[in-house]
Structure formats: structure tokens, C-alpha cells
Amino acid sequence: MSQLLGNAFSAELDWKPKTSTFRTGARYLDGLTAGTAVDVWGAEVGEYQGVTADEIFVVLEGKAEVTFHRTGETIVIGPGDVVRLFAGDTNTWRTIETIRKVSFYVPPVQSGS
């Protein structure tokens, strides 16, 4: 089962990150699932592993290779690609070109919260 849902659009953007990974101003949405948010996330060239939240995102710019540990699937994503992540899954991101995406997600519950 592919987690790459399709390609929505292509866009030219003039934007540069200041840190290796970054998430900007989450906007929490009333009337939806508690804790649901929309924000922008990005990463510079490099590789890292992480645990996902329930999320759907659209790549705005850049290119990355994402390997999903649960399924063993590896996809290459770029501008306009729409991807679904499942809470608790682990994956490895290999950012090929600085990437930025807009995400609709439910943040994971922090222990002790």
C-alpha cells in the first residue's frame, strides 16, 4: 500500500531555512479533533529517523526519500506530492534538497501531559 497519495501542484518559492529541521507556528483548529494542527515543517539536506503523528502533508519545495519502517516502502517526494503518515510509525528521512511541507496533523501525546 503506497503512502504517496498523489501530486497536487508545482510551485516556485524563494525561501531558505535557518536550522537543520524546523516547524513554524502550528495553528490549532477548533471544531475538529482535539489537538489537530496545521503548520509548516522543513529540513535541510541530511538524514534522520523519527516517530510520526497522524498526518497528511503536501510538499511545497525540495526533495526527500522517505523509508517507512512498518511497510519497508521507500518513496521519493517533491513539490506537490501528498503523503499520509500514521501515528506511532517510524521512518527515515533522507533530505536530498532542502524540503518544506505544509502539514495537517494530530500531535503525539507527550508523556507526563
Regions found by a protein language model. Give the residues of each.
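Short, surface-exposed beta-strand-loop junctions and turns on beta-sheet-rich folds
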Residues: I56, G72-T74, R100, P108
